[in-house]
């Protein structure tokens, strides 16, 4: 006795209908098509991008997730920022993001992209987090993150795309951008010479 188990049997409208007919809606079909063919724009400025470049090799093979790197933002629906972002680069990054068609997604990769990293403590030109410029969907911490972590971030983004509705795709997200050139912090001398510590000690004595 041969028993055939069809995993798609619950999606068929009637038991007597052909198994090639599957019920779905336009929203689910659109989400399935988009999550199966993400086209990323690689915005690498530092050492984190080297870890992402290792995904292209045969060991990790990111082609199985439908990722097709693009060199033009008009053909991409995902931008991966990897590395330090400076104030001079901020307008270019925003311009690339605005040229991407909707719906679009952002993965912030590495500590320098998320918080500014080690360059944020004593630098006047480093952006303290790329989310001050463009809205971020997935945060990927690490210095640098491993290729396995990058794959996990892509999987989480695919799950987010699968749960979206058609109204979410059309909703404008430009209001989430907080780009400003006025960082609220004080300029102090270099902390590596020891003079900064001496100045704090003198101020405490004067009080």
From Swiss-Prot:
The keyword Cell inner membrane does not apply. One of its GO terms (molecular function) is iron ion binding. Its EC number is 7.1.1.-. Disulfide bonds: none annotated. It is a peripheral membrane protein. SUPFAM superfamilies: HydA/Nqo6-like (SSF56770). GO terms for biological process: aerobic respiration; electron transport coupled proton transport; photosynthesis, light reaction. Binds 1 [4Fe-4S] cluster. InterPro entries: NADH_UbQ_OxRdtase-like_20kDa (IPR006137), NADH_UQ_OxRdtase_20Kd_su (IPR006138). [4Fe-4S] cluster binds at residues 47-48, 112, 143. One of its GO terms (cellular component) is chloroplast thylakoid membrane. It catalyses: a plastoquinone + NADH + (n+1) H(+)(in) = a plastoquinol + NAD(+) + n H(+)(out); a plastoquinone + NADPH + (n+1) H(+)(in) = a plastoquinol + NADP(+) + n H(+)(out). Keywords: 4Fe-4S, Chloroplast, Iron, Iron-sulfur, Membrane, Metal-binding, NAD, NADP, Plastid, Plastoquinone, Quinone, Thylakoid, Translocase, Transport. It is found in: Plastid, Chloroplast thylakoid membrane. Its cofactor is [4Fe-4S] cluster. NDH is composed of at least 16 different subunits, 5 of which are encoded in the nucleus. Belongs to the complex I 20 kDa subunit family. This is NAD(P)H-quinone oxidoreductase subunit K, chloroplastic. It comes from Psilotum nudum.
């Amino acid at each position: 006795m041969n028993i055939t188990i069809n995993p798609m049997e619950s999606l068929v409208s009637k038991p007597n209908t052909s198994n090639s007919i599957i019920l779905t809606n336009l929203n689910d079909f659109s989400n399935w098509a988009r999550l199966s063919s993400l086209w990323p724009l690689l915005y690498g400025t530092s050492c984190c991008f080297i870890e992402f470049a290792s995904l292209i090799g045969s060991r990790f093979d990111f082609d199985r997730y439908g990722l097709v790197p693009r060199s033009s933002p008009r053909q991409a629906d995902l931008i991966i920022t990897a590395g330090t972002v400076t104030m001079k680069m901020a307008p270019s990054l925003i311009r690339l993001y605005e040229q991407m068609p909707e719906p679009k997604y952002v993965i912030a990769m590495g500590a320098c992209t998320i918080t500014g990293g080690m360059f944020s403590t004593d630098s006047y030109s480093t952006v303290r987090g790329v989310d001050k410029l463009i809205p971020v969907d997935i945060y990927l911490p690490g210095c640098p993150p491993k290729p396995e972590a990058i794959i996990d971030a892509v999987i989480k983004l695919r799950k987010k795309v699968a749960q979206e509705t058609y109204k979410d795709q059309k909703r404008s997200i430009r209001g989430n951008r907080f780009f400003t050139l006025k960082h609220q912090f004080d300029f102090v001398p270099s902390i590596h010479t020891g003079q900064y510590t001496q100045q704090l000690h003198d101020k405490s004595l004067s009080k």
